[in-house]
Amino acid sequence: MISHIPNSGGNNSLMKHDVVQGNNIVDLDLLRNFNGVPGLNRDNFIYISNIFLNIKQRNEKNHTINMFREVSISNDTISVKFYRNEKIECACNFLMDKDAQGYIDLSDMNLTSCHFKGDVISKVSFLSSNLQHVTFECKEIGYCNFTTATVDNVIFRCRRLHNVIFIKASGECVDFSKNILDTVDFSRSQLTHSNFRECQIRNSNFDHCYLYASHFTRAEFLSDKEISFIKSNLTAVMFDHVRISTGNFKDCITERVELTIDYSD
């Protein structure tokens, strides 16, 4: 049984296992060897995830193979199940570090094809991480940081996001539909072709955003203070049948914007 992965040389040495090396049979055997191994940490998570992602990358043209990671978070530990065609190939627990703010540190990571599950996801830093084809399925996300993260094809199946930061995040086809967005900072983000349909949006900031072709259909802007889109690019954004009390659209680009208001003060 493998108890620890050598960590000499830091994370860079762990990242050398790339898609050029090995093959699927070798890598699947290696991945399975880590099943249930105790005492794993952040560096081990990066290493094992790279093995998994190498297999996934080799198979990306084979649409009959479905690979993803199911992740749950409890205190300082993340539990990860590595799936291939609905079968768990490996399941491990990883003790993670916390950053200076006391957030679980998932920053600067490749989190492609992760499915985060749980009741509440709180105080997690995804700073500058790569989140492509990621799903968050939980009741609530609070006090999380997605600053400068890549968020392509991310789905938030949550009831509520509160005190969450997306400053300078970038991505397309992000789905927030039917969520309560309470005190969420999207300023300077680039979220194109994204979905805010039927959201309840409170005390949130969209200043300096690039929101090309995003949809706010039947969204409700229910803020104590005005919703701000100052200097945002709203080209081809749909604000159809929205409810809004106070909003600031100063210096916006509004070419091909569609706006119909069901209610306004």
Where are the model-predicted features located?
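Tandem repeat scaffolds
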Residues: 20-26, 30-265
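Non-Sec secretion/translocation targeting segments of pathogen effectors
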Residues: 1-18, 28-30
